[in-house]
Swiss-Prot record:
Localization annotation: Nucleus membrane; Nucleus, Nuclear pore complex; Chromosome, Centromere, Kinetochore
Source organism (scientific name): Rattus norvegicus (Rat)
PTMs per UniProt: The N-terminus is blocked.
Gene for this chain: Nup107
Residues with PTM Phosphothreonine: 46, 55, 64
Modified sites of kind Omega-N-methylarginine: 60, 68
Comp. bias (Polar residues): 35-49
Top-level taxonomy: Eukaryota, Metazoa, Chordata, Craniata, Vertebrata
GO biological process assignments: female gonad development; mRNA export from nucleus; nephron development; nuclear pore complex assembly; post-transcriptional tethering of RNA polymerase II gene DNA at nuclear periphery; protein import into nucleus
Modification Asymmetric dimethylarginine, positions: 60
Name of the featured protein: Nuclear pore complex protein Nup107
Disordered: annotated segments: 1-66
Subunit structure: Part of the nuclear pore complex (NPC). Forms part of the Nup160 subcomplex in the nuclear pore which is composed of NUP160, NUP133, NUP107 and Nup96; this complex plays a role in RNA export and in tethering Nup98 and NUP153 to the nucleus. Does not interact with TPR. Interacts with ZNF106.
Length: 926
């Protein structure tokens, strides 16, 4: 049946199930074909470097502000977008731009423009693959937060991108940041989409992270757009600003305005940015819009009117419009058919959504698709008038734009003010005419509201410029004064935003990324740093890890551009992020962020991190990474060792005079022992390893932890002293070693002598207590037992002789080693020879205390050995050694210790007297 005649037909609206199924089947088939085609040609989230100019506001022609360096001989192809994009702006920023993402679709398949936007943010340029499905399934089986697990790779991805780009490609870097976020958003969206209602609570964190990464993605997009323009502007000369001629057209005037006025230009960039966000979210209209595909509008009303003309009509006589011109419902104040009214409301809402996304051409296509070509025409009137033939020429060129744009705009303004129209229809024409008051009621989110303000601001500033620069004889009614004379500033926009009565907008205004976006738009880096400081002081530990990553890389971006950031805030952000990386075990990333701290802080921060690294292989890797990041590895490793060895709050204590077992080695002691490993990786640090090892061993010796001290000693490579001398000679130095190194070597040898003496004493002590036992014979032993006893006695005598010989050798050895300590060459044990070294009061104090703690005890032990082996005369010679002015050992003895030493010497003298000798061991002369 020919529907165009409408004769004797039932309602033509697609409400019949069969028709609906058929239509939807056809539509679905077409969408599949379109989607398959677009998957090969379009990324579902448009890379920012490939954004085709949109139509974000009225008075837009295909325009991207060209580089001002080209203004002497302007290339019109840049202005009109016919040859390529401006080198300054990857993203179209022109107030006059009028190209959509899809420019070659006819009216019959307009829906294809949206099929690749099915998931909006939740899409990416990558093709779906079986491998990706498997990876997603694996991620979803992980612990409590699959989103966090899936997005963990972003930390390393961002660092790799940062290291890959130089300062000259900083905007390519920002674009890569955005692409990383987009890829991750794609993954998280798939995870969320597969969540069931039973495990939605588990995936709620993933959904929150998805939103967070979406916001980060668009913030990088905004940053690149604004700062590319700002940097380019700062490099260009002020006197190259474009000025329109006297008889310039509207279009020429506005082009010149965009060239010279950064406020207008950057405000338009904000509008473009907000429209790109809306475009990402817009979805697939082929699924959402349910209009009948005939190019006849208000078809149900038309059908009802046709039916009423028939004499046999018995249906409803409810009042309807009697005419079907576009103004009829308003003029007659009569309604449309209910179904048409529903479709009309739905259509207007989607039209506004398209306008909000800067897709005016798509909105016009939709109007024509739905039979409202007249409405498509009303969306055309914003184009700026330009007659290229005014300046003469051999050939006539077509005139552009609307010569009656002022009348059109006033009509749009009035239409937006008329309460008889639907709120979305009023909002459409409010957006076209710059009527902020009528545009705000349909703006429910922060992005929508900011878009409304900035769109109207640009519209107003452009209109003011046209009014003052374009000569016209038209004396038609003006737009309202408050619109034409508005004094717009970026700060004023956000002040107005703060005063809104919409609760949702106020809440969203406080969200982290919206605060960042606000200060980026304002260009207020100091204000942004103050906000960062507030966040850190208020909730440092609860800030999302990805937000900290963003904050860190934003600061690095500003530094790369040479922009000043508040140093103390930048440092705190970096330190907080580094601590996050430490907590999350991102070991390979820490060095490269630490190197951006001031040197002293970098050393302290990385040393703090290394304290927790215990595996040898991992330690070596961390030092290699520190070298790659140009950190001061030598100072860092020294700091690590000093930090750990100074953690013990134990003090040097006086030894008791009795030989006792070593104090047990604790876990804290084990940390101090192992920390020396940090200094032995690099041979150039052998001198430092020696110094730090000595410091640790001094403390262990004071606490009688000889085994722990020995373990530290073993950690120092045996060739360390030779290595120190070799390195000094390789530097071509003919002078002696530095005093610090010389003294460290001597101290190392002192400790070695003491440990050897102590070890030999312990060995002798154990051997002395392991003497063979003399066999015993029972009183009533048999002959056989007596024979066996004789054999045992012979074996005992043999074993005892061997034992005695070994004991004598050990005794001689321990005597020698103890004398080596007590009579240490060149000034004594633990006494520096070089006095020209840098003063170290703590070390000097410890060495004096060690002499007082160890030497008296060693002297008593030596006396015990000599006395127990009957060497009484040599015992008395200890008095000569202690009192000698050459060695001055008496200075390290306390009065109590000297008294005890004299008591022991008295005992030895008595033993000599018992042997018939004089008190000093000499024969008594008769």
């Amino acid at each position: 049946m020919d529907r165009s005649g409408f004769g004797g037909m039932s309602s033509p609206v697609i409400r019949d199930p069969e028709v609906t199924r058929t239509a939807r089947k056809h539509s679905a088939h077409k969408r599949v074909l379109i989607q398959a085609n677009q998957d090969e040609n379009f990324g579902t989230t448009t890379p920012r470097s490939q954004i085709i100019p949109r139509t974000p506001s009225s008075f837009r022609q295909p325009f991207t502000p060209p580089s001002r360096s080209l203004l002497r001989h302007p290339d019109i192809s840049y202005i009109f977008g016919t040859e390529g994009r401006s080198p300054r702006h990857i993203q179209s920023s022109g107030y006059l731009g009028n190209l959509s993402m899809v420019t070659n679709l006819d009216d019959s398949n307009w829906a294809a423009a949206f099929s690749s936007q099915r998931l909006g943010f939740y899409t990416n340029t990558e093709h779906h693959s079986m491998t990706e499905d498997i990876n997603l399934s694996t991620v979803m089986l992980r612990e409590d937060d699959p989103g966090e697990a899936a997005s963990m790779s972003m930390f390393s991805d961002f660092l790799q991108s940062f290291l890959k780009h130089s300062s000259t490609t900083v905007f390519d870097l920002v674009e890569e940041y955005e692409n990383i976020c987009a890829s991750q958003v794609n993954i998280l969206s798939k995870i969320v989409s597969r969540a069931t209602r039973w495990d939605w609570q588990k995936f709620s964190k993933t959904a929150s992270m998805l939103w967070l990464l979406q916001q980060e993605m668009v913030t990088w997009r905004l940053l690149a757009s604004l700062y590319r323009d700002r940097i380019q502007s700062s490099l260009e000369e002020e006197n190259m600003f474009a000025i329109a001629g006297i008889n310039a057209s509207e279009k020429t005037v506005v082009e010149a305005l965009f060239q010279r006025d950064s406020l207008v230009r950057q405000s338009q960039l904000v509008v473009d940015w907000l429209e790109s966000i809306a475009k990402d979210e817009i979805g697939d209209f082929s699924d959402n819009i349910e209009f009948y595909a005939k190019s006849v509008y208000w078809e149900n009303t038309l059908h009802s009117l046709k039916q009423r003309q028939l004499l046999s009509y018995i249906g409803s006589t409810r009042p309807l419009v009697t005419e079907l011109d576009p103004d009829a419902p308003i003029r007659q104040k009569m309604p449309l058919d209910d179904l048409d009214r529903e479709d009309e409301v739905r259509l207007l809402k989607y039209l506004f959504t398209l306008i909000r996304a800067g897709m005016t051409e798509e909105a016009q296509r939709l109007c024509k698709r739905c039979g409202q070509a007249w409405r498509a025409a009303t969306l055309e009137g914003w184009k700026l008038h330009h007659d290229p033939n005014v300046n003469g020429g051999t050939e006539l060129e077509p005139v552009e734009g609307n010569p009656y744009r002022r009348i059109w705009k006033i009509s749009c303004w009035r239409m937006a003010e008329d309460e008889l129209f639907n709120k979305y229809e009023r909002a459409i024409y409010a957006a076209l005419s710059g009527n902020l008051k009528q545009l705000l009621p349909v703006c429910d989110t922060w992005e929508d509201t900011v878009w409304a303000y900035f769109r109207v601001m640009v519209d107003s500033l452009v209109e003011q410029e046209i009014r003052t620069s374009v000569m016209t004889l038209d004396e038609t009614e003006e737009l309202p004064r408050e619109y034409m004379e508005a004094n717009w500033t970026l700060e004023k926009v956000f002040e107005e935003l703060q005063a809104t009565d919409k609760k949702r907008v106020l809440e969203e205004n406080q969200e982290h990324y919206h605060v960042v976006q606000k200060f980026l738009i304002l260009g207020d880096i100091d204000g942004l740093m103050d906000e960062f400081s507030k966040w850190l002081s208020k909730s440092r530990s609860s800030l999302p890890g990805h937000l900290l990553r963003f904050m860190t890389h934003l600061i690095l971006f500003f530094r790369t551009l040479g922009l000043q950031t508040k140093e103390e805030v930048s440092i705190e952000v970096l330190k907080t992020y580094i601590q996050l990386l430490i907590n999350e075990k991102h070991t390979n990333l820490i060095a490269f962020y630490t190197c951006h701290l001031p040197q002293d802080l970098a050393v302290a921060q990385y040393a703090l991190f290394l304290e927790g690294v215990t595996e040898c292989e991992q330690r070596h890797q961390c030092l290699e990474l520190a070298k790659e990041a140009d950190l001061d590895v030598a100072t860092i490793t020294k700091t690590v060792v000093e930090n750990i060895r100074k953690k013990d709050n134990g003090e040097f204590s006086h030894h008791d005079l009795a030989p006792s077992l070593d104090t047990a080695t604790t876990e804290e002691d084990r940390l101090k022992i192992d920390v020396i490993d940090w200094l032995v990786f690099d041979p150039a640090q052998r001198a430092e390893a020696l110094r730090q090892g000595n410091a640790i061993m001094r403390k262990f010796l004071a606490l009688k932890k000889h085994e722990a001290a020995k373990e530290v000693f073993v950690k120092i490579p045996q060739d360390s002293i030779a290595e120190i001398y070799n390195q000094w000679e390789e530097q071509g130095m003919e002078s002696p070693l530095p005093a610090e190194d010389d003294n460290a070597i001597r101290e190392h040898l002192c400790i070695r002598a003491y440990l050897e003496a102590h070890e030999t004493f312990n060995e002798r002590f154990k051997h002395m207590n392991s003497a063979p036992q003399k066999p015993t014979l029972l009183s009533q032993a048999t002959f056989t037992e007596k024979v066996a006893h004789e054999h045992k006695e012979k074996k005992y005598e043999m074993d005892h002789n061997i034992w005695k010989g070994h004991l004598d050798a050990l005794t001689a050895d321990v005597k020698e080693k103890m004398y080596n300590v007590l009579l240490f060459v060149d000034g004594g044990w633990m006494v520096d020879v070089r006095e020209d070294a840098e003063e170290d009061p703590e070390r000097a104090h410890q060495m004096v205390l060690l002499r007082k703690l160890c030497l008296p005890m060693l002297c008593f032990l030596l006396h015990t050995i000599l006395h127990s082996t009957g060497q009484y005369q040599e015992c008395l010679q200890l008095a000569d050694m202690v009192s000698s002015e050459r060695h001055k050992l008496y200075l390290v003895f306390s009065k109590e210790e000297l008294r005890k030493l004299l008591q022991k010497l008295r005992e030895s003298s008595l033993m000599l007297l018992d042997q018939g000798l004089d008190p000093l061991g000499y024969e008594i002369q008769s």
